[in-house]
Amino acid sequence: MGEQRLARSSFLWGLSGIYLVAFVSLYAQIPGLYGREGILPAWKMMRFTGKGFWEQLKDSPSLLWFGPRLGLDTEMTMEMICLLGALLSLGALLFSFLRDSLVFLLLWIFYLSLYQVGQVFLYFQWDSLLLETGFLAVLVAPVHALRWKTSVWSSHDGVTFWLTRWLLFRLMFASGIVKLTSRCPTWWGLTALTYHYETQCIPNPAAWFAHQLPVWFQKFSVVATYFIEIGVPLLFFLPFRRLRLFSFYSQVVLQILIIMTGNYNFFNLLTVVLCCSLLDDQHITFFQRHKKPQHKGGRVTSAFSLYSLISLLDVPIFGLLVFWTVKYFDLQINWEKHSVESRTAFTYHDFQQWLRTITFPTIWIAAASLGWEILKGMYRSASVRGIFWKLWSTLQWVIFSCAAVAMFTISLVPYTYIDFESNGHLWPEVHRMFNAVDRYQLVNSYGLFRRMTGVGGRPEVIVEGSYDRETWTEIEFMYKPGNISTTPSVIIPHQPRLDWQMWFAALAHNSHSPWFASFVYRLLQGNKDVIHLVQNDESLYPFHAYPPTYIRAQLYKYWFTEVDQSGQMPKSWWRRRHVEEFFPAVFLGDPFLDNLLTQHGLKDKPPARRSLDAPIPSALRLIRAFLHPLPAPLLLHSFIFGIFTIYFLQAMFGGVSKPGVAKQRHSKPPNEKKKQKSNSGQGESAAAKSSGHGADTVRRNKKNEKS
């Protein structure tokens, strides 16, 4: 792969934006989710157990342990961490010098600290993915304090940036594999997308239209998903540039389609950011129309010709990938019906055999790719002139190469979860290494949409309140489906974590969601912070004047409406049918409710509130009072609009380069530049003496150097 300086810079810029979104989105929900009287109070996770301070910090690594030393309770410490994280990530988004390893280390520590007390509301795969990506950014980002005069170039950059490609491979490959290993009949029958759009957590309006597409197209889309998630990732580590670029665009197209048809917070955006690892600088600067230097000499021409011949191998490789897809999914064009017919033409046993065969070869191919990057880094370090610079570059190469090998090694444990037989064949030392760092979320296993839920109707919990236990009023949420006539929400990149957990709660008995009892309890109390999670505008909350006396929850099945045979659009987005009672009617002091709360420790009294008159608590209260009325999606969209406005104005009037485009000066050590200049001068003299057009050649070379 060619140079990836701009690709790396784009990755760091994009990750800064993802961090900003994650911190701001979570900040808006802290009082209702984790406050002293929230649904799952965070202070319960920070109880001192008699161990020493540093021992507790080791067991549960979180900056929240330092909150009491600053005069802050747990909730306010979380708010301060979110605000600091948002401010730091905003700075990294706007200023390239802040995209530093130390800055990304702080961002990772901030999010890990929140994750430790997040409980069920932060246990999503994208939270784990952000933590793993964030830690890799610590290795990928430049350490400006150690580079002195060289602010961009380092011999180990290709080694550490390779880890993001490996993470992207594990994410996409596992996401495709688990769909088949789960034995879900909809994934095996290629009908999953006929249910997906209406059964996803928070559909958007485009999901309704996607649901209306013909069945043959939905089945073909599932085949395309397998092709992109299972087949294409196998191309990530092959030495063929065009295959990598094809991999990049296929992955990005898939993520964009998911973004267009669902509200998946920052997950798909983070995946697109990881896709930067498949790009090189030549492709990023393609539209700048840089002229390529003229190659001189038979040796260069021969090498170029050999490279051209080798690069032709990408055509048969791509052809084989398409052939296997057509064969194993029996793709056939039905000209009469103007459709593409498809079916799964292999068995579960066949797939397991293939998976067992392919798992370790993918590891060895990835290891060979990493080894090649390490060798290239060693060569670059050895090419640096000057004893001091050479030693300094070699030392960095050794340290970061060892770190990359260690990260790759421990990641093999969660990666091989796709085939437990392969997982059992890993060396015991690898498992011990993984267990030693597991608490820090450095590496994780992935596999989204393992099984398609909602076959036979989308289950939805509808909460109802009453004053007399006779007349019940539905409590409508801002984002999740409820009223069948309400237009589905568009809230990306915000994640309303209560709405998401309501979707999971509907999939099982209420006993599988202990937090739901606490949620009902807070609504009976009329807790303003919890109500704010349900409706930002209190006037839309049906019990804003007085809390309800009774609350219950009903389980419904929802389906998207359909266009009738005449082509007329329906008046409602949804149709629904009552299934059963999800949670019985309860009231404050109800023995059933009290028993649930006591059983899960959700009725414990919080510790005494700390003084709010100190400077830091006072400042945090002012910020909260200012931002509290704003809906979280509006707050995030305002940030995004403001950031792009700043970049637009800079591009128009400031002459500032585009985001992610690194400046090229000081890209190599000074001695390396002198060597290049010296060699260039000697080459020009030789060319001028050996050619009748020597003067033209020199002028042409100088022109290329300037461009």
Swiss-Prot record:
The chain crosses the membrane at residues 11-31, 78-98, 102-122, 126-146, 220-240, 256-276, 306-326, 358-378, 398-418, 634-654. InterPro entries: LMF. The keyword Transcription regulation does not apply. Residues 696-707 have a biased composition (Basic and acidic residues). It comes from the Eukaryota. Disulfide bonds: none annotated. Keywords: Endoplasmic reticulum, Glycoprotein, Membrane, Transmembrane, Transmembrane helix. It is found in: Endoplasmic reticulum membrane. GO terms for biological process: protein maturation. Glycans are attached at residue 483. The keyword Transmembrane applies. It is a multi-pass membrane protein. Involved in the maturation of specific proteins in the endoplasmic reticulum. Belongs to the lipase maturation factor family. This is Lipase maturation factor 2. It comes from Xenopus tropicalis.
